UniProtKB/Swiss-Prot annotation:
GO terms for molecular function: N-acetyldiaminopimelate deacetylase activity. Gene3D superfamilies: 3.30.70.360, Zn peptidases (3.40.630.10). Its EC number is 3.5.1.47. It comes from the Bacteria. Belongs to the peptidase M20A family. N-acetyldiaminopimelate deacetylase subfamily. This is N-acetyldiaminopimelate deacetylase.
Length: 377
């Protein structure tokens, strides 16, 4: 068997210890041990909750370039069958954050040995999948002190071949909001439905009616998605359910559409209360800002990537994906791009297995990009 690169090995280590948002204790310790093994002459390392900031001091800094990598996994039971599969039952790096971290460590390693003129700030961010680490990290005292002038991030894209970079100027990812709806009626015996108030029936009606919002209330040219991913109700087959809970997500390409969708959800839920004589409550949970790429920086990046020759550059369409990196881009100019990893299974799938060839190729490309950007006269 051929030897694997050090950063592929790191990815496999990290893949085995996925942790949920703000619980990335093992992950943080693993990263810190590696960072402490690097030359420390130009490094400043500070922790924030389960995240890490690493500043690489430049030789004659005029600006600071930021690079963000997210850290958390998902509550998914892995089904890849890989020898380095998750050791944490019911947890998986099913969104590629293990790949993101290994790439960041590869780039950091190079610049710890070969600093730029400008400063570099590596931001290892917890809780991207929820409840959202970017916004509080952005508001932290450390970020205020070390705030970069520009910031960059990537996300793996299973649908693109290895060697592909995809991005666009302006809006890249959607506004997103979690959605939780609780219904309370009156339970009873299945043989006497007229004496009870069935919340499973109410929940089913609500799911159907929510889909009419996208079909009939949102401008067809202004995309929106309402997905109910989980329904829970009832206790046993012969008891009418007194409670039901719906959990889902809202995604829109504009804040105006998000506001309209929420108004319609509230109106429809109120209608369910009246029609089914029940009580209902709505909680929107975590909300993520749209990812809006700085047009000039993104165009410059795409021009560099095309001239580089080592990657295939695609100008992609905006996606309904949610990413809390949008909060950082709302405050700091920068951009995000897709990195092709050629997997037959998509993000958040229990069998997602990114092609690891993408790791070293991404490291080499980002070293070239940051060297060009951070040494420019």
């Amino acid at each position: 068997m051929s030897a694997i690169s050090p950063f592929v090995a790191i990815r496999r280590d990290l893949h085995q210890i996925p942790e949920l948002g703000f619980q990335e204790f093992k992950t943080q310790q693993y990263l810190l041990r590696y960072i402490q093994s690097l030359p420390q002459e130009r490094l400043q390392v500070r922790t924030w909750k389960t995240g890490i900031f690493v500043k690489v001091n430049g030789t004659s800094p005029r600006k600071t370039i930021g690079y963000r990598a997210d850290m958390d996994g998902l509550p998914i039971r892995e089904e890849t069958g890989l020898p380095y599969r998750s050791k944490h039952e019911g947890r998986m790096h099913a969104c590629g954050h293990d790949v993101h971290m290994s790439i960041a460590l590869g780039v950091l390693t190079h610049f710890a040995h070969h600093p730029l003129k400008d400063d570099l700030l590596f931001v290892f961010q917890p809780a991207e999948e929820g409840p959202g680490g970017a916004k509080p990290m952005l508001e932290s005292d450390i970020m205020r002190e070390w705030k970069p002038d520009i910031i960059v991030a990537l996300h793996i894209a299973p649908e693109y071949p290895v060697g592909t970079i995809a991005t666009k100027e302006g809006l890249l990812f959607a506004n997103t909001s979690e959605l939780f709806i609780d219904l309370k009626g009156k339970g009873g015996h299945a043989a006497f439905p007229h004496l009870a108030n069935d919340m499973v029936v109410a929940a089913c009606a609500l799911v159907t009616q929510l889909q009419s919002i996208v079909a009939r209330n949102v401008d067809p040219l202004d995309s929106a998605v309402i997905t109910i991913g989980k329904i829970a109700g009832g206790t046993v087959q012969n008891v009418i359910a007194e409670h039901a809970r719906l959990e889902g997500t809202i995604r829109t390409l504009s804040t105006a559409a998000m506001q309209k969708v929420k108004r319609r959800i509230e109106a429809i839920v109120h209608g369910i209360e009246v029609a089914y004589e029940c009580e209902a409550s709505i909680d929107y949970g975590a909300m993520y800002h749209e990812v809006y790429n700085d047009p000039d920086l993104t165009a410059e990046f795409m021009k560099f990537a095309k001239a580089h020759g080592g990657v295939n550059v695609i100008r992609c369409k905006e996606a309904m994906t949610g990413e809390d990196f949008g909060y950082m881009l709302a405050d700091i100019p920068g951009f995000m791009f897709w990195l092709g990893v050629a997997s037959p299974y998509g993000l958040h799938h229990a069998k997602l297995a990114p092609n690891e060839e993408a790791i070293d190729r991404a490291i080499a490309f980002l070293i070239d990009y940051f060297s060009w950007k951070g040494n420019a006269e």
